[in-house]
Amino acid sequence: MKCTSVNIRNVLDISLKKKIKENTNLSDDEIIIIYKRFNYISSNGKLNYDNFEKSLGILGSIQNAYLYKSIFKAFDLNNDNYLDFYEFCVAINIMLKGNKKDKLKLSYRIVNAGFNSNEDACVHKSSCMVNKFNTKEDNNMNGDNINGDNNNNHNNINGDNNNNHNNINGDNNNNNHNNINGDNNNNHNNINGDNNNNNHNNINGDNNNNHNNINGDNNNNHNNSHNNNSHNNNNKAENSLGQPLNEKNINDPINKHRNSQSIIYNINDEYNEKIKKNKKQDYSNYITYENFEKIVLSINDIKRQLLGTGDEIITSQIKYTFRSLSILCDDGIYRMNFECYKKALKCNEFLKLLGIHTKVADVFLQHELLKRKDKNKTKNGTMRNRKKYKNDSNRIANHLIIKSFSESTNTRGSIINDSTSFLFLRKQKKKKKKKKKKKKKKEKKAILYERKSTFSSSMENKSQNKSQNKSHNKNIKSVSRILSRVNKLSSTELIPNECDHKPNEEVKSTSDVLTPIFFNNGDEKMNHDTDGNMVYHKNNVDDNLVDGDVVSQGKRCSFFSSCENKKNEENKSITFNDINSGNINTNSCIMNNMIVTKESNEEIINEEAQSSYIYNKNIFCSKYNTKKDKNEPLKCDLFECSFINNDKNIVRDEDSNHKNVRKTDDYFIIDDNNIFDNGPIIISKNKTNDRERKLLKTFSSSSLKKKSLLKNYNYHIKKKNKDPNVEDTNMLYHDDIKKEYDHKVTKNNKNTCNNNYYNNVSFNSSAYYEYHSDIDLIHFSNNLKKKKKKNVTSPRPSSKEYERKVTYHKECCSNERMKNIKVNESDLGMFCVNNDKTNIEDVKEKKACDVLNRGCIKEQVQCKISEFENDKGNEIYMQEFKKCIEKYKEYVNQGEGHLKDEEEEKNDDEEEGEDGEDDEEENDDDDDDEDGDDDEDGDDDNDDNDDNDDNDDNDDNDDNDDNDDNDDNDDNDEKSNIKIENKKDVPNIHNNNDDDGINCCTNLFKDDDTLSALEKNVTNNNLIKIMSAKYLYHKFLEYKDFMKNNTTLFSHFNKIYQHEDDKINTDNKDVLNYRPKHNNDINYYNIPCEDQIKSDEKKSLLNVEFGDDIIKKKFFISSVNSHYVMINNNLTKEQMLYLIRNILMSIEDYLKKEKNRDYNKIFFLFFSIFIYNTQNGGDQKEMHEDEKWDHTNINEDKNVEKNDDYKNLSNNENSVYYNTMLRESLWNKKKYIKLNIFKNIILVISIVRYFLHTITISQKYTSSYDSLDDSNMIKSMNSLKLNEINILLNRASEILEKYSLGSVENKKVYINKSNYYNSSKKGKLSVSLRQNKQKKTFHRILAVYFGHERWDLVMNMMIGIRISSIKKFSINDISNYFHHKDVIQLPTSNAQHKVIFKNYAPIIFKNIRNFYGIKSKEYLTSVGPEQVISNMVLGNLSTLSELLSEGKSGSLFYFTSNGKYIIKTVCRNIHNLSKKLLPKYYEHIKKNPDSLLTRLYGIHSIKYQNNLGRKKKKIYFIVMNNFFSSIVEIHRRYDIKGSLVGRTVPETKREDHTIALKDVDIDELGDIINIGPENKERLLKVLKADADFLKENMLLDYSLLFGIHYRELSKDVVNWEETKTNQINHIYDYKGNCIASRPFHQCDYGGIISVDKKKIFFFGIIDIFTKWSIKKKFEHTFRTIQKFDGKNISCIHPNAYAKRFVTFIENHMK
């Protein structure tokens, strides 16, 4: 019997309904609908797993899938093996209406095999509801043994972390499992005796002699239920990440203490506190590796069985990802708690395993581990058991470790975007008393260190000095909460076998110096934690040392280091000597994973002939003072650690390099997409099974691309490979790197990098091939050729030189922090060379922040600033620094009073008045004014960005990289169509590409009268760059004058300006009074800093620290390549870092529009760090004229006209001279100064970032390795200097990425769904229609959830399309392509209910998709069900519901996740008509590639059994394009038919931009399609051709879907000055047939940019399948009589309809 709503209300219990409403967001109607569906899929009000599996529809055809079981367990809150209605409502509410937190908890339970923790289970408002409901439904007060589940799970359901059954019922917590099991017989007897106060048996009144009578179980089960091993059931089954676990010794008193939870009375508080510390941590609610692996494999198996395809999943890949995102528990097993899982869901690699696909994740996983198939199967040594250390109560052990990925800046959730930048550690308890710590110092003990690791390629050490004042502690309070008490965070360094302490090394006591290296005695059971409290070791682990060739590789070793904070004491570094006397100065031994004993002047590691490599990370350390025989092998435990013997050539020398390299095609191309990302990942390639023969290849995690590159890029690679000695240029060998850097040092001023490498970043990946059409590739290829012609002026270098350039380009632009490794000719092994002269400087610098953490980088920078300021040695410097800034502000404000904060608001109002409208939705994080915002948008799309979907990241400041006169472009080069510059008019300006990291408004001067004159000579982009460079130089002169006038006040600042001699001053005067008489001999102002550097015999500290390759590095100013800056080598390293930190903080404050922002401070800091300089070049004359105008008050126009030299200039020079005048007249205007400030601030941070990046690739730093191989986990973090630089580099990258628009991350893809408004009609007929509509809407509430009819429909549609699209057909067997029909039977959970899927004309539609450039992979992933299956794991189905909408005809619209395609259900008549018109439609779009008609990508039907009845139901649907899918938002849309009767929307509805306005509204609002005469003619031609096609086929009632994106409302990145409508849009074959199309009206972000550059228009003709039939004729007659207007009504004859349609649109075009 079909239930009505009334019957359901009567059946549903009122109290249950009230309970559901209190704890969910469901309405009464929704509860009733869900109840109806629940009763249909369940039996007797209880839904078991079998019925739940059937409710999944086609997904449930995969029986007993682990994923479905986990989902079922997650829904089952009370663990009774079935779902009642309450649990079902809670689950549906979370998946459809729940907030992000509830969905996250549900997802956590799903992945954790349905385990319900205290937080997770209570998703409703009252946690006690679960117990009450369980008591009512289950009649079980305890439920401990009902499900046979682990006891630990049950305890967590009720919010108790203790493993005690008494807590289940809220009884006294005095009983304990261990005591029950024989730990204390007296206690056990009391439990079962007369004293029933603490007994479970009293609860149910059962026999008191048996503890397990609560559940009515056998009395003999007492020991089993309370056996101590029951707490370890999960641990026994877990062999996480290949680590065998030790069985715990029950008789061991230490274990008993760890597992004990009893409270011992009559003892002192100190002993009781020790007992609490020794409690065992409960990890039962943590996700284990086994659970995660099962989920991943289950998802992949479901996709493989349903779709016939599945991703290639490697177990080691899952292992590596899980381990990198999890924490190491005190029992030596990696687990993932809720916080870890929360962060992991932001990691692309983690989401990829769960089936959430993004381009970044695809690139990462396709290359990360698939190349490891040749990996050595026999691993060196087995994974040993970890030692169990005691820790504080309810805390994870101090040696928690997190493996890390490298960072990535991809916008879709890359690893650096919060996914791996947090530390997964619990809160630390307060520090212990100092007295206890002093007592423990005297004993022989070991200090355990709590280690942390971030997801970055670098680590930073931070020593929190206790002597710091309280104000400083407040500043770092938020940091200290996360970072805890980490004294030193060491990083692995190259450690030779010959590793001694220097005999003359001054070493302080072991408490204040680096923890000595010692041998860990296996018999010793006593150790100490960081607070000096005694903890115990268990002597049940076998640890061995691998020492060169003496000990086999099967053995393991680990070195540990630790150090301790001391008041007023400095840590000394221990120096290790290799056999070649190369010193490696370290602060914390630079060995992460080693335990060695210290003997003051004795050898630590046996001397061997060759040095060895240690590569591992993140192990805690301990120390022990007992002297051992130095030859005694080390005993330690290690998760994964091993040695590589250097006697086997890891890196070949120059003679054997090319001979020993194996030939392989398995190489990777370094992509330049994110140049400054942190964290190299090292992939090791095995030629044989010997580990020693591995070759290390470096590449970035975000740069892992497929082999397929664009042809033009491969052309360069082939050119490089002409050298016969080079077999694989993508392999970066260490000796080659050495050569490259030697080449770089010797030819410092030569630019070896061509800028057009930086302009094609986003195209150098296979993702461009897969997700873009052939048209995009052709545009890219053409532009690349044009740029090549434009930029290549000098003859092509030899193959060797070109190889050096390209390889150096790869090295500079990759994300890795590559540091050279020098190869010793006498020793083929690798060793580091550190030229640091003093250990004191190392010690001071290495007191850095604890962790490189994206979430707290700002706090770390502020922390270091405070530390520098509080240093007593910097008092004088800080006093002068503060005075100098104050004086500078006063000095500058005298000349720039118009830029004060009071005047800025006036300027904003003026600019708003010029624009005509006030932008109320402007982002606060953008520029300072509207012009600045437009400036950012304008320069976003660079010249090579022909594809709208893949724009380059404009954050790259690569135009500052080593520009040189050798790269000057030839004046006679062929003129390019790309708008960069007019070379004929500006002959001396070169390399002015738009990829300079500065986004500016290309339409800034649209209201200026001088714009027309400027456009004739120089493009707007170039003009703005020159203006900004001119303003920067003006600020420099201002700074220089200030420093000269205050030389006596500030003795510590920029001595370069304080000690200039009279000759220099004379030269400066000559410069200011310059007249252009000698054009060829311009002697520009040149600061003699280079001469001082060369002549200064005693180098400063910066020279010692960084070397000449950094000190002499030139950072060129954008657009004026003769101007550059160099680092001020008179600064000390600490001063330089302090100034950089200050400039980063100041820039961010300014860009955030803080109240106290000050741009003058930014320029002051910048010129204090860098010295502005010039060199003789073509741009000097232009800038020199600007200087003259800067320092003269004479009227420019009159002087220029009277100047005889100006009259004698040639035409080109004349235009340059005139343009320079115009620039001067523009840049000094008030409204443009703020633009110049913003552009220069972005330039400043770009230069700072590139300078920091240059340090990381400097010769003085070795490479950072991070191998993905389990046995080769390398984490050589080099030194703390690099880590400090990386912190600042990350901070600079974050600021530049956030505030300089143009990044891919800032892009959004808008689906831009339309809502339909139908005016209500009066009369009885309209009333009945409204009632029917309400009923339909009522039944469509919550259309998608388990068991619902729409769920089956959507799943069947997506899976049917997915399967049919990959099916291959034999063309010879198909007689008629248009009438071909492919029939597929989809799997179902019920064999009797068959689902038939039909795909019509599959070959034709595949050709149509190819015609419009749709790749098969992109189409399948868009319409396929992969995302839905994965979203089930994430506890989220709301996305599916949001993508579903109802059309005005009642049709179901499903938008794909990327918004490009729409699946629309249609009636049978439309279905038949579409098939009938398909041949004509196909021919029409072939002849008219720019057609506006809806693009059909597929016609399908599904026939299935209706769940609500026994009749079979057939659904027809089509797949078509979404005209409004764009990276910009549609602010207004119209649905135009040409009719005026009833074609309007009320004003109250017009505010909703998702509602399509109509014909009358466009006249009232006055919107005009102003696309220019050329585009108007083309559009009208296409429109008439489409109208004729529709007229010929007697079609009507179609409409033009017309959308508008307004510039004034835009928050998206748009290059308004460049349109692509005139580019090549179609490809024709030799017969003249179009084989590929890209309509011109979709070239500009999916539309056409208007002539006034203020709008983007989108067009498309929809609803084209309405036939002129008898029904329409009758409607025409009826409406004519009703409205008394036969012409303006909608339903008219197709001929008249087409004519009216075209005429109406033409009248609204301009």
From Swiss-Prot:
GO biological process: phosphatidylinositol phosphate biosynthetic process
Domain of life: Eukaryota
EF-hand domain boundaries: 68-98
GO cellular component entries: plasma membrane
EC identifiers of the protein: 2.7.1.68
Catalytic function, reaction form: a 1,2-diacyl-sn-glycero-3-phospho-(1D-myo-inositol 4-phosphate) + ATP = a 1,2-diacyl-sn-glycero-3-phospho-(1D-myo-inositol-4,5-bisphosphate) + ADP + H(+)
Means of activity regulation: Catalytic activity is increase by myristoylated ARF1. Phosphatidic acid has no effect on catalytic activity.
Bias (Acidic residues): 902-973
Binding site for Ca(2+): 76, 78, 80, 82, 87
Residue ranges with Low complexity bias: 140-235, 456-468
SUPFAM superfamilies: EF-hand (SSF47473), SAICAR synthase-like (SSF56104)
Bias-annotated ranges (Basic and acidic residues): 974-987
Keywords: ATP-binding, Calcium, Kinase, Lipid metabolism, Metal-binding, Nucleotide-binding, Transferase
Keyword Kinase included in the entry's annotation: yes
PIPK domain segment(s): 1334-1709
Listed Polar residues bias regions: 236-248
Disordered as annotated region, ranges: 139-255, 427-479, 895-993
Biased composition, class Basic residues, residue ranges: 427-444
Single annotated GO MF: 1-phosphatidylinositol-4-phosphate 5-kinase activity
InterPro entries: EF-hand-dom_pair, EF_Hand_1_Ca_BS, EF_hand_dom, PInositol-4-P-4/5-kinase_C_sf, PInositol-4-P-4/5-kinase_core, PInositol-4-P-5-kinase_N, PInositol-4/5-P-5/4-kinase
SMART domains per UniProt: PIPKc
The keyword Aminoacyl-tRNA synthetase appears for this protein: no
Function: Catalyzes the phosphorylation of phosphatidylinositol 4-phosphate (PtdIns(4)P/PI4P) to form phosphatidylinositol 4,5-bisphosphate (PtdIns(4,5)P2/PIP2), a lipid second messenger that regulates several cellular processes.
Name listed for the protein in its UniProt record: Phosphatidylinositol 4-phosphate 5-kinase
Lineage: Eukaryota, Sar, Alveolata, Apicomplexa, Aconoidasida
